[in-house]
């Protein structure tokens, strides 16, 4: 009874006085209508008491407003209290505690002992046993970031650092303590933890005394499978549960954790919730009670009121909330003291059990300048708007460094501040900021920011025995161990360091996850200038650095660096002198300087030395040096040289500045073998070369080298100067000096040399050393063996031994170097006098040229002329001819692939993918499929499949990687996988890329003949299997054969001797009815007689006549037309006519019969065949005038279907016919045609494209017969439109989309007539149009496509703004208005117009919002005039009183509430103004007087909608009893009023504005209006409700189709788990060819759809697979597939991908996938059956039979019958019916009582067999010895069959047999 009273307080609302009010709040907390009641009572008091009580009422109203504002105060640590229940989100999971994100940017902590009692008990057991328990999970295994949890505040305290700390508990005993056993009801959503595992389920601790909660195993299976990865639930596991059954008055409850039940759980009145036991996380249905600047007030569960602060509004709906709006909300918390219920409208909280998404932390710690304030909240903090539009929040404590200097005035909206992002709140999805100077200037904000080895400053906090604690940031502390307090060990560190001292430290180790920071104060380490080692990869041989000794052993010292990197100094490397006992010389903690000898990062091993090598001595000059001392050149010296002359082998040069002669061999000009001869060719006498290396001097001859690799080696000091420095394992850079049969000799820059034996020259088998290397080639060599006595060394050149680091980086460096050298050659060429050479130097790959075909060579390549200069050789290889028919003199557009700078040839391509390159933004590091287009010796050029961009990639990834077997060599046309390293072509014209694994290469199909298969041609495999036998058939021969397979457009026939023949669909019937499929007339296995009419060439699959010399090696083309089978038929073609000639014979307008081959989704056309060698295309727009057909052409057209088409003409290649199904394609005036939108131009109209390249334009005046505010809103690129052609002048189509034009039969009402000239206008006429522009003398107003009128300012508005610029703001271009024609001047072609309300009958075009822009003087003047005219003395007195106190009032429940929010109303857009204007027109038909602005009514509309107006104050509003705001009637708005006070325009708690008096005076005209009668108000109320209902029904109409991305966003927001909506959204983008957006939608869907909705997610995965298969690369498809397998049941994903491959006719890929499936899922019968069906569809019956045998071997015996029956069924449908019968018969002979098999056998025979066969089976089955129930089933089927197909006699016969069976059974029973 107590609960009942609590939920339903007795009695009505009553007036309360000040003393009672406080009492009521503390005692009768459940009456949540206190705010509304106060307002209502205040209003009644006002009307009853009159002016005498005004002052008292205003005080009460002000306190009420303050109380309302306090309810919206967001949570702070101070407002929390112990026992408060609150919804939280797991932010971090540590070993011993959880960090919980709470609403409004708060944070709390849950100790490991606060999970549940059972878990704590297990922990105690583990501690007692001192051994880990197997069934006890750690916190990271029980909780994951993002989980929503219900918490209770257990304590509020202060940490050691002086910070406020919130301790929370998840223990159900504490969270659900407010529930009693009697209060439990079915459907309640509770949280609990698993307390124990039972035989049939789990006991769950829900924390309710006297209640035992049980979760049946069956109900937990779905959760275990989806959430627990199949593992059983463990003690302590947190669950969201639904109460399913309640027994024994709550003593026992049965729970469910199913996803569907939990995610849709709603708290209802039937569950008897009250304020004491409302739990956070409950989802409730609510109704908006009030819309305020601080948030929303909601009614829910009938009697409760809650608040939604600005942080928890739905971001996508903010600004659209209105009173009485129905919403769903989630309870965040109920404050135990104030009893305020905090709610959230964020969609992610409205699905219980769904985890929150983790926010990106990439900007965490960023310092931001000039961040504008969005709003300020007194007791909470301030909101800010970041540059990317994201909302951010700073708590009050973070707005200044101290409370003393805090100034609230600095946080007015618009003020800017410098701040830093310190955290992200997952619960609020916003960034948390700090304005504290100490935090902004802090060197580090979090542990993640600190790198090992960094020098940091800190403050000493304390000194303990374990070390010194140092504060290095606001929330970070580090430890300095005792060993690191100084360079030497300190006994009394407290004497040197004191608490508060600032110290400089160097970071030794930082572990952000464990929040562990170790530092050192050793001076030598801190001040060291040597490089630091933070990982083993940093340790390069020869590197000198500082470290510290951590252990001294007898075998040496272990030295440690940073980040736990350490190495060993062996005993012999401790000193140059022998040290017998290291422990006496060295000590732990000693700082030492070491040099790295060797490092193996993979094994984390490092060898160090204390013996530091001194600088090498300078090289002595050779004894016989002939140069003077002052002019000596040292070996290894870098010099500049001048070319003197060229020789055969190199360049004679002079070393500058002393002109010492030297020789530079050709092979030493570059590291790239191919570039040496190129540089040698273009260098000439006088050229200067820089940075040339002196290699050797002998007999006065200086040998030079210009190889960059060798130059870098010498500069870096990595070249050993003498043999003593050589040791095994060293990696050196040198060049091939000579090549022998037994190996190659390698020389190094210093003159040292070694032998690389044949055995270790390469990882590949070496047959000939000269195949692998050439003299002078740059190589990397690893020393394997050293003979110090003979000073010889053995080297390895194997790639596995000579790794130079990351292969991708090396590959890119080699490519960069090669291209830079080529660019240098171009520079040399540009200095030549020849115009040809200069032109070649300027040409780069990717450039486009318009050329003329000069000659087609025998090899199929094409030579072009017409280049930029004469004599320029431009060639396209046969491959780059792209199968095009070219003739001399033809003009072609080509793209340059490469310029051969040695042969002076330009390689070009005709490939359309390259010529029509797509402009798409590329990402660095992205992977792409590419096709090799050109090969050079060092690099290859490939084109990206998606865009056609040209990219270069190196053919080698190592200096030694020069040998390739033939099978490894790339070929032109081959597919490769590339990773882009640049996104812009640069000076080379090429993108730079690195090739992926060789396994991703794909081979191109070989085409040995110049006649190539059409790019869209798909060859029947039946015509390509095996070798085509030579035959002796000739024209006119009659042959007999058996139908082998049937395809949509042809039938394959097997003739005698295994010869394969083909019958085209056009040669089956003489008269083909439209819509039929002729090939279906023939059945597989049927014997046919045909006549030979031609043949198909096996190489090109092109049709050949009999007379062709290659006819004997062709597939005979046959005909079974009755007319051609007649004797004496001689009309056969015996001479050769090419398809191009045949196509010329077709005339435009001619009607032909064609056969649909397929619908090309990508290119949007139907591919058809007219004859075996004549193909055609029908653009989608020419298939129908019906939008339904164009939207789903696959439903209208079937493959193989015969179509009647009209010839349009040959296409551009002259090899195909263009056809139309809509009659002759003539774009002439008066015609109606279908087009596709290609561009939408704001305020102008559309650009529409038609088939075959025609373009037209549609003006905004021709979009519809009725103009609209947003005429272009429904149009997006790629949308299909029905157009009427107005004119075709100047080859530009002028179009109209008006229904009266495109569908005149509908007799569409023309609201806005067409205005094409001034002749169409009459004086006095009312016309609508669009604002054109604002000019000094008036407003130009567009009345038609070419007609513009002028409205002078005196005829624009009754208002006269002081600034004319305000017209631009309030009359934007394109705004729809109504105007009256005042005067026409036909001579000057001038139309004068008026917008005034008196002329148009419409509201003033300058809305109330403009009034706010006028100066205060103008407002006062206008108001004074109104007061004089109307003489409202009473109103004047009232306004004077209000003006005196206006400054004190913040918000009033009646009219006074408008005052502080007036500026907000002024800021609203034109849309609200227009709505209010149209509203006034409906409600009050009297025209306004000039002095009355629309702002008054606008404000009335707004604030009445917010429940803050009195009905008696305006004639617009009806009079009604004020019960509660939810019952206030709505105005008749044309569309739902949008509350525009969203996150962008929140009014914070600022001092009230000074316009109160003005606001009050604005309302006077309303107070003076005549009151309406009660009947009028009731009628008006009914109209308003009907109008609102109509709008709501329209918005809720499930049949309403989305037409924009915003529509789809709304839909998926309302139904986030509906895959159908997501797929429609993807299809919407695909129709607009927005592939990336479609991908993004799919990825968004996968993130949004709940993981419990497995099927919905799978649907999206399948759609994404389809998308990648159709528009992506094989690599992108594979990646998506691998992800899909990871997140779904693998078998389903495999089967879906196989179907996708099969449907897209990628049969090879499908076959390979099926074989993978057979290995992985051999026990799944579905895989075998699907593979069998696939093979049968491909006419591979024999392979299908083998699959059946394999299936029977792999599958268990119990599955055999089902599999055999299914294969037999497939044989019936797709293969040989006779074989199917045999399989069924064999199966039924073994299993005669398998009635399911009998039933399938009967079904198949009915479909594919004869009536005799069916009756035979029925006769057999009704004589079987089966159960009577089964027999009844078969008798019934037999009877139904005879009724449908038999005679009355047959029916009676079946009945007689049934009766006979019944009698026989009865007699047996009687016996």
From Swiss-Prot:
Pfam families (UniProt xref): S1 (PF00575), S1_RRP5 (PF23459), Suf (PF05843)
GO biological process: rRNA processing
Gene Ontology CC annotations of this record: cytosol; nucleolus; nucleoplasm; nucleus; small-subunit processome
Reported function: Essential for the generation of mature 18S rRNA, specifically necessary for cleavages at sites A0, 1 and 2 of the 47S precursor. Directly interacts with U3 snoRNA. Involved in the biogenesis of rRNA.
Highest taxon of the lineage: Eukaryota
Biased composition (Basic and acidic residues): 1416-1459, 1469-1484, 1575-1586
Renumbered ranges of HAT repeats: 1599-1631, 1705-1737, 1775-1807, 1809-1844
Residues recorded with modification Phosphoserine: 7, 438, 1360, 1362, 1476, 1493, 1498
Alphabetically ordered keywords of this record: Acetylation, Isopeptide bond, Nucleus, Phosphoprotein, Repeat, rRNA processing, Ubl conjugation
Protein name per the record: Protein RRP5 homolog
Annotated crosslink Glycyl lysine isopeptide (Lys-Gly) (interchain with G-Cter in SUMO2) location: 1416
Domain S1 motif: 83-171, 187-258, 281-346, 365-436, 453-522, 542-611, 636-707, 729-798, 1036-1109, 1149-1222, 1230-1298, 1324-1396
SMART domains: HAT, S1
A Gene Ontology molecular function term of the record: RNA binding
Organism from which the protein derives: Homo sapiens
Compartments, as annotated in UniProt: Nucleus, Nucleolus
Complex and partners: Interacts with NF-kappa-B p50/NFKB1 and NF-kappa-B p65/RELA.
Cited CDD domains: S1_Rrp5_repeat_hs10 (cd05701), S1_Rrp5_repeat_hs11_sc8 (cd05702), S1_Rrp5_repeat_hs12_sc9 (cd05703), S1_Rrp5_repeat_hs13 (cd05704), S1_Rrp5_repeat_hs14 (cd05705), S1_Rrp5_repeat_hs1_sc1 (cd05693), S1_Rrp5_repeat_hs2_sc2 (cd05694), S1_Rrp5_repeat_hs3 (cd05695)
